[in-house]
């Protein structure tokens, strides 16, 4: 029997955090920036293909509050188009004791399309009914296969005054948590199905 509690899938980059990779060219500029940014958390390192990368990570304002509060109402999981070793470096810091996220999905669970964009097909989720699954992401393309399950947020790029997670928390608790079917509620607010349908129809007309 499928669980009744709703599942909130959350994107990582530009939804919860922003990352700047350090290079010889931008090192001094980033050093100055991290000293003045309230969102800066830590400089992480991870290895990939025998190379070591250093990255400055910025948390979206109210990140901890958002996870603490929203986890009382939803099951949470990460669905990111990032590579596993990169994502886990940051997620292990955000959630070291696995308090918040039930599981993590990475790039290998996504469908690549053009220009480094990815679709996040929710058919990969087997333990929840589609009416109880919502994907919170800053990329509209992520919702392409199930637009009615999408919740779009603005991209985060180190803005100290960002309040998107406060707004997201209110929307999720007030509108998504009590609803019978997240798809009907999301369509009422976002109309993504109509948007994608129009885009598909236009492409067909242009190719005929």
Positions of predicted regions on the chain:
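Ser/Thr-glycine-rich phosphate-binding loops at phosphate-binding pockets of nucleotides
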Residues: 15, 79-83
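Short, acidic loop-to-helix structural element flanking the phosphoryl-transfer center
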Residues: 47-77, 112, 116, 122-123
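C-terminal cap/substrate-recognition subdomain and adjoining C-terminal extension
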Residues: 72, 83-208
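Conserved phosphoryl-transfer catalytic core
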Residues: 29-53
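Short amphipathic alpha-helices and their capping/turn segments at secondary-structure boundaries
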Residues: 1-8, 122-125
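A short acidic/small-residue loop/turn micro-motif
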Residues: 24-25
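Asp-based phosphoryl-transfer active-site loop
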Residues: 4-21
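Short hydrophobic beta-strand that contains or immediately precedes a catalytic carboxylate
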Residues: 9-11, 78, 135
């Amino acid at each position: 029997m499928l669980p009744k509690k709703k599942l909130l899938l959350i994107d990582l980059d530009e939804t919860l955090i922003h990352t700047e990779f350090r290079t010889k060219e931008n090192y001094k500029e980033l050093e100055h920036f991290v000293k003045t940014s309230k969102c800066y958390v830590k400089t992480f390192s991870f290895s990939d293909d025998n190379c070591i990368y250093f990255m400055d990570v910025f948390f979206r304002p109210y990140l901890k509050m958002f996870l603490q509060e929203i986890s009382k109402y939803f099951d949470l999981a990460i669905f990111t188009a990032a590579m596993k070793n990169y994502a886990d470096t940051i997620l292990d810091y955000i959630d070291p004791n696995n308090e918040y996220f039930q599981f993590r999905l990475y790039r290998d669970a996504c469908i690549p399309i053009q220009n480094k964009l990815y679709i996040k097909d929710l058919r990969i989720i087997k333990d929840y009914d589609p009416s109880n699954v919502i994907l919170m992401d800053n990329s509209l393309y992520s919702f392409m296969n199930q637009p009615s399950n999408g919740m779009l947020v603005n991209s985060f790029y180190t803005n100290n005054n960002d309040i998107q997670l406060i707004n997201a928390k209110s929307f999720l608790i007030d509108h998504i948590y009590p609803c019978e079917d997240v798809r009907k509620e999301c369509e009422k607010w976002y109309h993504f199905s109509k948007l994608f349908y129009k885009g598909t129809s236009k492409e067909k007309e242009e190719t005929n």
